[in-house]
Amino acid sequence: MAAPVLRVSTPRWERIARVLVCLLGILLSLYAFHVEREHARDPSYKALCDVSSSISCSKVFGSRWGRGFGLLGSIFGNDSALNQPNSVYGIVFYAFQLLLGMTVSAMAALILMTTSIMSVVGSLYLGYILYFVLKDLCVICVTTYALNFILFVLNYKRLVYLNEAWKQKLQAKQD
């Protein structure tokens, strides 16, 4: 016997928060991509996020860790198609979170949660590199780390909410 189809929806505040967080993430990632491209084209380029020598996003984006998380170039080679600027991965991640967040399937909720966990782990890794290795503060980077954590919380709340809603709907169908 097939599993019953249970129609539920997520709270409106969650959908609005997801759209805002994902759009902000996409915009910041596009700006990071722009800064990296301009800095590569003109090394004297000064981005809006370059406040001082220790608060500089273009210094971070231009570093080894600004592409492929500092790992993919070592594994696949610097010319590999996978060794893209981190901002490209950010654009894909936030677009994916936005689009998949429009569905309420159990599989989508699990994928959203799994990718959020991966983004938080990646943020912790890059935050460590930022602070302890590069000894820099990148406002764009830190903001995206915060957005990743907010998405993690949203996805966790979504999973809990949908689980509870499905339980209630299933209970009502059985009664």
Curated annotation (Swiss-Prot):
Catalytic activity: phylloquinone + [protein]-disulfide + H2O = 2,3-epoxyphylloquinone + [protein]-dithiol; phylloquinol + [protein]-disulfide = phylloquinone + [protein]-dithiol
GO terms, biological process: vitamin K metabolic process
Keywords, sorted A to Z: Disulfide bond, Endoplasmic reticulum, Membrane, Oxidoreductase, Quinone, Redox-active center, Transmembrane, Transmembrane helix
GO cellular component: endoplasmic reticulum membrane
Top-level taxonomic group: Eukaryota
Regulation: Inhibited by warfarin (coumadin). Warfarin locks VKORC1 in both redox states into the closed conformation.
Topology of the protein relative to the lipid bilayer: Multi-pass membrane protein
Transmembrane stretches, start-end: 13-35, 87-101, 107-134, 138-159
Disulfide bonds: C49-C57, C138-C141
EC number: 1.17.4.4
Side of membrane Lumenal, spans: 36-86, 135-137
Residues in the Cytoplasmic compartment per record: 1-12, 102-106, 160-175
Binding positions ((S)-warfarin): N86, Y145
Enzyme class, UniProt record, top EC level: oxidoreductase
Cellular localization per UniProt: Endoplasmic reticulum membrane
Task of the protein: Involved in vitamin K metabolism. Can reduce inactive vitamin K 2,3-epoxide to active vitamin K, and may contribute to vitamin K-mediated protection against oxidative stress. Plays a role in vitamin K-dependent gamma-carboxylation of Glu residues in target proteins.
Annotated family: Belongs to the VKOR family.
Record note on domains: Partially oxidized VKORC1 forms a cysteine adduct with substrates, vitamin K 2,3-epoxide, inducing a closed conformation, juxtaposing all cysteines (S-S or SH) for unimpeded electron transfer. VKOR becomes fully oxidized with an open conformation that releases reaction products, vitamin K quinone, or hydroquinone. Cys-138 and Cys-141 constitute the catalytic redox-active center. Cys-49 and Cys-57 are the cysteine pair that mediates transfer of reducing equivalents during catalysis.
Name of protein: Vitamin K epoxide reductase complex subunit 1-like protein 1
Organism: Takifugu rubripes (Japanese pufferfish)
